[in-house]
Amino acid sequence: MKTHPQAILLCVLFFITFGLLHVVEAGNQEGFISLDCGLSPNEPPYVDAATDLTYTTDNDFVQSGKTGTIDKELESTYNKPILQLRYFPEGVRNCYTLNVTLGTNYLIRASFVYGNYDGLNKELEFDLYLGPNLWANVNTAVYLMNGVTTEEIIHSTKSKVLQVCLIKTGESIPIINSLELRPLINDTYNTQSGSLKYLFRNYFSTSRRIIRYPNDVNDRHWYPFFDEDAWTELTTNLNVNSSNGYDPPKFVMASASTPISKNAPFNFTWSLIPSTAKFYSYMHFADIQTLQANETREFDMMLNGNLALERYRPKTFATGTIYFIKPQICEGGQCIIELLKTSKSTLPPLCSALEVFTVIDFPELETNQDDVIAIKNIQNTYGVSKTSWQGDPCVPKRFMWDGLNCNNSYISTPPTITFLNLSSSHLTGIIASAIQNLTHLQNLDLSNNNLTGGVPEFLAGLKSLLVINLSGNNLSGSVPQTLLQKKGLKLNLEGNIYLNCPDGSCVSKDGNGGAKKKNVVVLVVVSIALVVVLGSALALFLVFRKRKTPRNEVSRTSRSLDPTITTKNRRFTYSEVVKMTNNFEKILGKGGFGMVYHGTVNDAEQVAVKMLSPSSSQGYKEFKAEVELLLRVHHKNLVGLVGYCDEGENLSLIYEYMAKGDLKEHMLGNQGVSILDWKTRLKIVAESAQGLEYLHNGCKPPMVHRDVKTTNILLDEHFQAKLADFGLSRSFPLEGETRVDTVVAGTPGYLDPEYYRTNWLNEKSDVYSFGIVLLEIITNQHVINQSREKPHIAEWVGVMLTKGDIKSIIDPKFSGDYDAGSVWRAVELAMSCVNPSSTGRPTMSQVVIELNECLASENSRRGMSQNMESKGSIQYTEVSTNFGTEYTPEAR
């Protein structure tokens, strides 16, 4: 049998509860949603006699479907919530919409009983979605007539609205009998990523009872299991304290199973489907025997032959829960947990209960919530009753709402609505004010309806809007001048006979701020100007071609920037640069490029002016690269270029001013370190990651930054992060193209060792550098420190983790004010980013998703007192009956 006591990192987490952390009285159903699907809306809420749970009709939570009842001969088999059902003969996707608390773990359970409601005696198969992602395939074949098919999942909400959708996949008509949501404590059932799909939940007893609410305050269902050939049962009538956050029912913890043979192991096996699935397990222990002075119960825990936890001693009459902090896999999908008595133990191991969940990753992000709220308001305003207008508006793409187009190009950014077409939809009333909240809208078509009132001025404020078609309505009044004068907008107001349209402005506008006929004049003028410019350029070319350029001098011709520069951004003269900086009065900083000065443009806009020093390690090539990159990329997390100066030997870049300096200054304490708590640091790196992900996936061609570090992450007055310093940036090849062989460039410590060794550049080089940044914000340690046993930060953190010393790497300035799970996830993410092999590193898209989940976890953290010790890949929670004391394991 293999033993690897240091193969997996251990973390031991203790909850001091004083019996008060999770007080939920029987009968308290706060936050519960219990829907009897198909119950008549005329029936009031009722209390189910079997469970004391209050159920209501689902009528207010779903906009489609018909109701039915199971065969009367089967009614005696089921509780009342199962007797009715809702079925969906129309449409492909039909959804329930439920209001939830953002960032909260919910146990979500859907139950299905066909019950021959239609008299056809057939099996059903359809898909169940949670938001835009597949949750489960529902097949009633096994339980065709008299069984309940149940799907359960524990899911952390990413918005204030949760949608559960039934998807028709073939000839079967989807059905549902009940839908239940139960909020859980946020510090329980956490995952690194994804959600937990229920596999089984057993308590080890000879009892036949299924335990649920009110015995379980969270309404989990516990099923008995007992191996008669290998186990014997222990029971107690004494009180067992089960309040450890997971709070298994007292009835469950009042019994336990132990091997019949005193020296035999306690074994439990199960299978995973598919065999490659990852899982989390939660084992609940309590020693329910009063031990004598000469008695000891101590055991090791093995998973698939590997040592996971040593010398565990269950507390007497108090509950401990052991679980993995990282998802596990089993070879061939066959899993076995063994509890082995140690040499010190006089008693065999025992266990009360085990829960196992498989991990489901949900890759699709929900549509931007502002857009969702806006389109729902528009739907309600006009009473749009399209069958497809259910669930997420944009994703999955095959279920996108009719009349919408969305931008879902970036997997790390929520999709946004860019096109709304409600033409010929029998709309009445005024133009809905909610349209102004679709801030990414590019095309709006409300033509051929019966809209009245005026053309609202807010349409001119939609910056992305390129096309508005309001033709064929009954609009009246004057057209706002701001709308008529908006450049780049194509406006069609034809057919509105009551509309006051000066100068024929109701005719389709050309998109350049004037009518189509004006375009002819513009084209003529532009054509003449183009001929003059081309002629002049040809003459200059013939003159300069005759001149020779000395080898040791860069000519002004060869130094010319891309011609697009002068048309896209302002080019400043050197005298203007001197004026804006007040003769270079205020220095903001110094870098490899040169000095950076404070300045103002037009006596209003603050800017940062970076001057190229003649002795700079960077030169005109880097200057040109940075200007040309910043002129073609625009992202909220990339520093914006206001302009540049290229006059003789005077080269400068004029950026937007970042009032809070760079991240490194704050990490060193130069700018007031009290602001940089864990949440703020997470927010900064999450935003920086979004900027870097845009360079990799949003640019054409995609770009590698090549110099990601804390000094190149700048912060504005609101501590919004923006990536800066693009002088070393290079494009990189797409998959299938030839790799780029470059001269190695970057900053020591942050430089990808694989890139340094091979000279082959790809986007994973940035991922490595970003991993170093992550380690900096977690540890607040220098990247290179020769006084450490391992000078480089990645090697040092790796050694500390191998020793199980997590506390030594976390910045003590946090003072324990952080979500332990989010810190662990960030550490593991950082270590995956600095994998020596680029193929083992995540993409920046994956990094963004992981950091956003860490941030969501930190944001949803509640005030629970807890201490953290490093012990490995297992966490466990203990409750002592002597309130105010902690259980501490032996040192390894």
Curated annotation (Swiss-Prot):
Sites carrying sugar chains: N99, N186, N241, N267, N294, N407, N421, N437, N450, N469
Active site: D707 (proton acceptor)
MF terms in GO: ATP binding; protein serine kinase activity; protein serine/threonine kinase activity
InterPro entries in the record: Kinase-like_dom_sf, Leu-rich_rpt, LRR_dom_sf, Malectin-like_Carb-bd_dom, Prot_kinase_dom, Protein_kinase_ATP_BS, Ser-Thr/Tyr_kinase_cat_dom, Ser/Thr_kinase_AS
Segments crossing the lipid bilayer: 524-544
Domain Protein kinase as annotated: residue spans: 582-855
GO cellular component term of the entry, any: plasma membrane
Key word Kinase present: yes
Repeat region (LRR), residues: 375-396, 399-422, 423-444, 447-467
List of residues that carry Phosphotyrosine: Y655, Y755
Location relative to the cell: Cell membrane
Keyword Mitochondrion assigned: no
Record-stated family: Belongs to the protein kinase superfamily. Ser/Thr protein kinase family.
Name of the protein described by the UniProt record: Putative leucine-rich repeat receptor-like serine/threonine-protein kinase At2g04300
Native source organism of the sequence: Arabidopsis thaliana
